[in-house]
């Protein structure tokens, strides 16, 4: 059957636009593909192909390539020559490696499916897929989201379910067009504040992680769907505790003093700081107290308040209150807090 389909395609020569060899028990990609220079769609899914043929690189008009459910062990170098490619399916293989430079020529790629493989990391070159709108890497062995991925300005849908990801980089704020983010069953402990900058985000699924609290401003996201079941969220169970006195390190005292002068636009301090880029970088990470609005650097009180999820959100069952993080600079400010703000008990 496969041979007959291939013969038919070859008879069409330059006029052949589509070749489908889905589930034909093929173990080797046909080298005669070079005789189909105007091929647009090549479907080779559900076979036993372990290596692509060199002739694949001649299919420069190809817009869709499906090699899903085969035996590939890497994303092959030949793919980088498919400069017209828009859709690439490599799901269900044994891929543990992406050949160097393979993404360099795929400037038109809008959809990439690498589900069900064995990837432990992604190359920096992932950031060169500038047209990508859909990326799916479910059920791999990823531990990190590379910051280069966050430069994909057109990305609207990102699937990273069932990996081993521990944290989300703050650079996620650059995914301005992201509408759907799926992070089910990872090892994520917290979401960065920068996720609250994703104005177009509508669907967020973080079920089955180890998140206890959400960043300040999280409740203002314009979500339509939010799922967080299977996370050990903080519960509203207040109890009385004795408050110690504020004891700051000399470094924190100095940092707060300098930060206060910077807020006043003190010209002398501003000029001095410009001469010390490392100090400037550290001070740029300062936060503000939610009570007095004064800046602090490395020492503060972690607090939580509870808000009801938006009525516009489709949410996990039984989610009544969302624990949202807030920071207080001192016990003095903590005493002036809103009654709905609680300190977080330290074990």
From Swiss-Prot:
Gene3D superfamilies the record matches: Ribonuclease Inhibitor (3.80.10.10)
Keyword hit for Nuclease: no
Keywords: Leucine-rich repeat, Repeat
Signal peptide positions (record): none
Intervals holding LRR repeats: 15-37, 38-60, 61-82, 84-105, 108-129, 131-152, 154-175, 177-198, 200-222
SUPFAM superfamilies: L domain-like (SSF52058)
Highest rank taxon of the organism: Eukaryota
InterPro entries, alphabetized: Leu-rich_rpt, Leu-rich_rpt_typical-subtyp, LRR_dom_sf, LRR_domain-containing, LRR_R13L4/SHOC2-like
Family membership noted in the UniProt record: Belongs to the LRRC69 family.
Entry protein name: Leucine-rich repeat-containing protein 69
């Amino acid at each position: 059957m496969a041979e007959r389909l291939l013969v038919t395609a070859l008879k069409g020569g330059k006029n052949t636009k589509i070749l489908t060899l889905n589930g034909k028990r093929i173990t080797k990609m046909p080298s005669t593909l070079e005789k189909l220079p105007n091929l647009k769609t090549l479907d080779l899914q559900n076979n036993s192909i372990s290596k692509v043929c060199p002739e694949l690189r001649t299919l420069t008009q190809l817009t869709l390539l499906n090699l899903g459910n085969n035996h590939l062990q890497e994303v092959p170098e030949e793919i980088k020559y498919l400069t017209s490619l828009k859709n690439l399916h490599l799901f269900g293989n044994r891929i543990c490696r992406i050949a160097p430079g393979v993404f360099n020529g795929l400037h038109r790629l809008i959809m990439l499916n690498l589900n069900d493989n064995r990837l432990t990391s992604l190359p920096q070159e992932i950031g060169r897929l500038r047209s990508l709108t859909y990326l799916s890497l479910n059920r791999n062995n990823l531990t990190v989201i590379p910051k280069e991925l966050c430069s994909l300005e057109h990305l609207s849908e990102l699937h990273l379910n069932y990996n081993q990801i521990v944290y989300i980089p703050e650079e996620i704020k650059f995914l301005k067009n992201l509408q759907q983010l799926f992070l089910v069953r990872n090892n994520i402990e917290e979401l960065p504040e920068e996720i609250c900058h994703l104005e177009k985000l509508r669907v967020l699924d973080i079920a089955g992680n180890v998140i206890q609290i959400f960043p300040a401003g999280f409740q203002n996201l314009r979500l339509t769907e939010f799922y967080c079941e299977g996370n050990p969220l903080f519960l509203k169970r207040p109890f009385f505790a004795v408050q110690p006195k504020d004891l700051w390190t000399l470094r924190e005292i100095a940092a707060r003093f300098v930060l206060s002068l910077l807020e006043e636009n003190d010209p002398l301090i501003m000029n001095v700081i410009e001469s010390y880029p490392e100090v400037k970088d550290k001070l740029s990470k300062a936060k503000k107290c939610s009570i007095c609005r004064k800046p602090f650097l490395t020492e503060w009180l972690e607090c939580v308040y509870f808000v009801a999820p938006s009525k516009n959100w489709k949410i996990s069952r039984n989610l009544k209150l969302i624990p949202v993080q807030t920071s207080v600079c001192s016990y003095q400010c903590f005493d002036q807090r809103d009654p709905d703000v609680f300190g977080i008990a330290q074990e």
